[in-house]
């Protein structure tokens, strides 16, 4: 995260600036990010995760508890049937698209339906949940309908590329079913990539691309690689850190191992998520940009023209 945005967010949380002022800083940094990505030769752009709200804040029927006496981990309250009227992410994408030139594709990141379901179940008191949703299937129906509306809204705004972020280790049957249902019901022509733990990906049906944490300790490598065989797999060649130049040979060897399972025409590279850095600094930010250049070098090795 840029230092100017970190500072603005800190001042906003301290009551020193308004939400409108924070939004203006976010907008400026997103414009700078788009232009920097273009100058680096990147053709898919995002807002960098620079917006500052909770994804569930705009949902109907659910809110964050305001009392400090809430049980630990039970921070959400279901107040009625869950749904969506207008999510601010629609306005955020409109801003991203308006500032993206014709030679780049704007991509929107969204928590996966299964991830949202599991968060609601984990952070809501069971008694409160039962009073509104005595049958879990009704909750699944409401979440599926809300996501359908959100994806249709994004599609109407011009979005053609969504990346769902899924859970990293835990999975329930209900979460898997919900993910697959939302994928089935998405607008035709909406490309969806899915980034999640191995177990989630193996049970996923209908995604266009898979973001794979190949170096993840919970990853059953051979099982996962056979799963993505003959699929349009997006392979993340590094997970939790930004590599140095001297590590390229090692990373190339890992990529070449993957080519035993995935045709090169179905393979691409993705960079580690900046959110993996717990305390981002200006030095980390510069290393992120250096990694963009290293990724281009790696792509030249793996995908020679």
For each of these PLM feature ranges, what is it?
Residues 1-305:
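Domain-level signal for soluble alpha/beta catalytic cores
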